[in-house]
Each structure stands twice: as structure tokens, then as C-alpha cells.
Amino acid sequence: MKKLAKMISVATLGACAFQAHALDGKLVPDQGILVSVGQDVDSVNDYSSAMGTTPAGVTNYVGIVNLDGLSTDADAGAGRNNIVELANQYPTSALIVGVSMNGEVQNVANGQYNANIDTLIRTLGEFDRPVYLRWAYEVDGPWNGHNTEDLKQSFRHVYQRIRELGYADNISMVWQVASYCPTAPGQLGTWWPGDDVVDWVGLSYFAPQDCNWDRVNEAAQWARSHNKPLFINESSPQRYQLADLTYSTDPAKGTNRQAKTDQQIWSEWFEPFFQFMVDNQDILKGFTYINADWDSQWRWAAPYNEGYWGDSRVQVIPYIKQKWQETLSDPKFIRHSDELFAQLGYGNSDGGNGGDNGGDNGGDNGGETPENCTDDFNFNYVSDNEIEVYHVDKGWSAGWNYLCLDDYCLSGTKSNGAFSRSFSAQLGQTYKMTFKVEDITGQGQQIIDKTVTFTNQVCN
């Protein structure tokens, strides 16, 4: 306790010397720290239910080779990924997305998966919210099999495509390092793709005490030296079993577990975690806490072939849950609210179209429903650059549904008796629309195609 008190005292004095200044990044809050939760769909849902709150940010993953986990369920033993489902479940939360290279960073850099990159960017860009894209997350983690040159080339390509496709306002690029204690110091520069293409520096925070916080401090200093905001993209009290109140010093197999009190666990891991934020308050602008029962997910479970992780769910121990809630009640932590997106520097993209569309379409249509609006599968004009595709519900089981424009598909939302989804489009252009829906009482699924010319019709 004396050592911790000394560390807090010195760090607090040092923090007072920091001067507020503008950081070079995108979707960076002027004040405060974004609080997000991960990292699989069901763990996020469990946290939200147990804590009685909507997370300000939610985290999930996708593989670039097959886009597994983007719009369909994917579980590689670390919990279920489905970014579209998660985004629809939390429509007013920021989205933090980790993209795996699936061990093929060279082919990614060579352009083999450029079409998948574009699909990913368009899907994320269509969500009306701040998106933090952790491209090739934990870039220097040896388990990922990355090489420096291909990694940097792919990072620069994605940054450029975000701008070319028109989504620079809501997709921010995060360069995340592993902060892994066994890695040698002084290597970050070899992985750096350039100040001009990095919006945030990210790090992982699991067991930094194993190397006296050297690796996380190195990452923080790298962000500071490049004037970039810092995001703790992955954090969890590794080797602690919160439900069982135990800790193991064995990172490989979790042997010789020691009994801990709830107060000990809080003081040993959580207090230094939040103190790290104090120490770096000049640059630290976001964190993601992985709130999961790692031991119940087969990738992390016994015999612990990928190391021993434990159980990090804060809700399972009343004392830890209370301390967590008390800590996050500090106004410096950005929680979910109606002002969340504005706090993150993201504007309301709906502001300019509503009145104009109403006037233009009312005049053109003469106040009457256009003749071609009688079709159940149709579209509405939103703006000269946005089309809403919809299909009237015909009583399908509809456990899933997708609306597509030129074979670019997104999960639809059901409202007022119809499934709908908006897409970027150009007025006057011809498009192929497709609707796919589960139909367990019929043929298993229905697939309906239609070719249309995008006009300023408004059908509903």
C-alpha cells in the first residue's frame, strides 16, 4: 500500500503539470474519456442488462478474408461476433471495430481483399455514428504474424479508401499495439504507418505489472510524442477470477491460484488501471473494458492453450460492481447520453434533408402516391445521395433479413410493417435491389430481385 500511495502521489503531481492542448486525431472528445465495453455480442448484452445501462461504446471483431462477424454470426471460441447485430442493438452507441488480417497481411497489402475492404468501409460508414476502426489490431503482437511493411501499406490503403468512399467524417483509424511485456522495447517506430494516416494510438492493458508498466507507458509516450489521442482498446484483469476471488501468477496455465478478497482485487488491478488514466490524462480519451467470463469461452478455457485469462465480469461481485459504478460516475467519464455523438465530435448528418425533401417531393408528386409505389418491394428518396430500400412484411418468420443495393447487403430494420435500410446512391442511376428474408414456413428463405432507376419518389 505504501508503494501504491507513493505512485499515486507522484503521478498526481505530474498530471497537474500537463497543459490542455488540441490532439491530432478524429472523433476525439474535447474533454473526458469515452467508456466502451467488449468484446463479444453476448458479453456486451450481459453487461448492459446487469448494470442497467446502455454502453457509450460497444466493441466487436471481423476477419477481413471472409468478413466473418460483419453481418453474420462468427465465433472462433472467443465469443460471438456480429457487428451489424451489435450496431442495431445499440444504435446510439459509438462502435469500436477490430479487424483481423487472418494471418494474410501480405495478401491484404497486395490488394487481394480490396473488395472486402470496400464492403467493410461501406457497412461501417452507413451507421450514423462515430466508428473507431482498429485495423490489424495489436499490430506488433507476434501471434498475428504481421510484417511491418505490408502492415503499414495496408493501413495507408484503408485510410485512403475511407476518404475516397466518403466516410471520413464518421470512421476514425486506430493504430493499436499489443503492449505485450515479452516484446522488446523501442520497436514501435518500425510499425508506424505515419502521422498522416493515424487518428488514434491504441494499446492493450491486461497484466502490465509483469513488466512494471513499461510497455503501456511506452505506448502512451509514443502517442504523446506524436500528439495523438490514446485509446485503451483492450483491458481486462488477466489471471483474476472475479467470480471465484482468485489470482494466478502463472500466465500460461493458471496454476497455484491464490485466494483474494474483493478489496484486494480492486486495489491490485483496478486502482492502477484507473491511475494509468490519471497519469495520462493529457492524451487518454477512451477505453474499452472486456467484461467477459473468459473461462467459459473454449478458446480461453482449460487446458489454456492460449494462456490463462480468468473471469473479468465486474457485475459478479457486489463490492467490485459498486466500486466500478462509483468510479465511472465521475464526470470525466463519457457515458451514454443524448449528447454522446456531439461530445465525440460527430455531427448530425440528418439536419439538412428533412425539410427540403418534404417540399420537393410534395410538389413533384402532387400530394398523391406515385403509381409505381403500389409494389411491395420499392424505395424512397431521402436525398440526391441517399436511397431507402424497403419491402412490406408478408408474415415471414424473419429471424434474419437483408436488403441489398447492387449486391451490397445490410441487415434491415422492421418498422410500420416493412423492412427497410438506407444506402448511398446517386439520383438518376439504375440499381439492382435485392431482399432476402428467412421463411421457415415456406422454402427456408425468400430472395427477391428488382431493378430500379433512382428517382425522387416517396412512397411511405
From Swiss-Prot:
Active-site positions on this chain: E138 (proton donor), E234 (nucleophile)
Protein name per Swiss-Prot or TrEMBL: Beta-1,3-xylanase TXYA
Family: Belongs to the glycosyl hydrolase 26 family.
Annotated ranges, domain GH26: 23-337
Organism of derivation: Vibrio sp
Gene: txyA
Thermal dependence: Optimum temperature is 37 degrees Celsius. Stable below 30 degrees Celsius.
Top-rank taxon: Bacteria
Ranges where the record places region Carbohydrate binding module (CBM): 368-460
Domain notes: The carbohydrate binding module (CBM) binds to insoluble beta-1,3-xylan, but not to insoluble beta-1,4-xylan, beta-1,4-glucan, beta-1,4-mannan, curdlan, chitin, or soluble polysaccharides.
Keywords noted in UniProt: Carbohydrate metabolism, Cellulose degradation, Disulfide bond, Glycosidase, Hydrolase, Polysaccharide degradation, Signal, Xylan degradation
Ranges of compositional bias, category Gly residues: 348-366
Annotated stretches, region: Disordered: 347-371
Top EC class, one word: hydrolase
A biological-process GO annotation: substituted mannan metabolic process
EC number: 3.2.1.32
pH-activity profile: Optimum pH is 7.0. Stable between pH 5.0 and 8.0.
Induction entry: By beta-1,3-xylan.
Description of how activity is regulated: Completely inhibited by Cu(2+), Hg(2+) and N-bromosuccinimide. Strongly inhibited by Ag(+), Zn(2+) and Pb(2+). Moderately inhibited by Fe(3+), Al(3+), Mn(2+), dithiothreitol and p-chloromercuribenzoic acid. Slightly activated by Mg(2+) and Ca(2+). Unaffected by Na(+), K(+), Ba(2+), EDTA, iodoacetic acid and N-ethylmalaimide.
